[in-house]
Regions:
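Alpha/beta enzyme core
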Residues: 3-19, 28-150, 161-170
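Thr-Gly-centered strand-to-loop micro-motif
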Residues: 153-155
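Short acidic/histidine-rich active-site segments
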Residues: 157-159
Length: 170
């Protein structure tokens, strides 16, 4: 469980005489209850992934997690848009372009949920790439222009270094 993971990390840090701060992040959690359990166990940040839900349901779930987490000083990442591909037991299929994050929705999502950072879809995917990825830098620029929180890109493994560097610059 979450407590066991936190305990293992703390023991490893102590054994290594770790001198730097360590963050323990719960990635791609799909339920409010699991986010609460992770926060109570000692995680320092959580990602609530309601990206498979309709927009209004994603907003409601993400806001609920952010409201709870912020009471404990915990950082929350929300996700809007879908990354095609596979991650763990989850598989998302479809047209990568239509699954990308809409900048106007991103702005509304951030404002309504109170998240600390937003994971967006601009052409990356989870799992192994069948064809070379192409990041939609113009879409990223538009999102960056309208949100006031850090932007997170998931599914970057296999993305050419030049595209990652261009995304960072924009």
């Amino acid at each position: 469980g979450f407590e066991g993971t936190v305990d293992t990390v703390k023991r490893a840090m102590k054994a290594a005489d770790c001198k730097v701060p360590v963050a323990l992040h719960l990635d791609h959690c799909r339920t409010y209850e699991e986010c609460v359990q992770a926060i109570q166990a000692g995680y320092s940040s959580v990602m609530i992934d309601g990206s498979s839900l309709p927009f209004e349901e994603n907003v409601a779930l993400t806001k609920k997690v952010a409201d709870y987490a912020h009471c404990y000083g915990i950082t929350v990442e929300g996700e809007l848009g879908k990354l095609v591909g596979e991650e763990g037991n989850f598989k998302v299929e479809g047209d990568p372009e239509s699954a990308q994050t809409d900048p106007d929705q991103a702005k509304e999502f951030v404002e309504r949920t109170g998240i600390d950072c937003i994971a967006v879809s601009i052409g990356t995917q989870h799992g192994v790439y069948v064809a070379a990825p192409h990041l939609n830098i113009e879409r990223l620029k538009k999102i960056h222009d309208v949100v006031d929180v850090p932007i997170v890109l998931h599914g970057g493994s296999g993305t050419p270094k030049e595209q990652v560097q261009e995304a960072i610059r924009n």
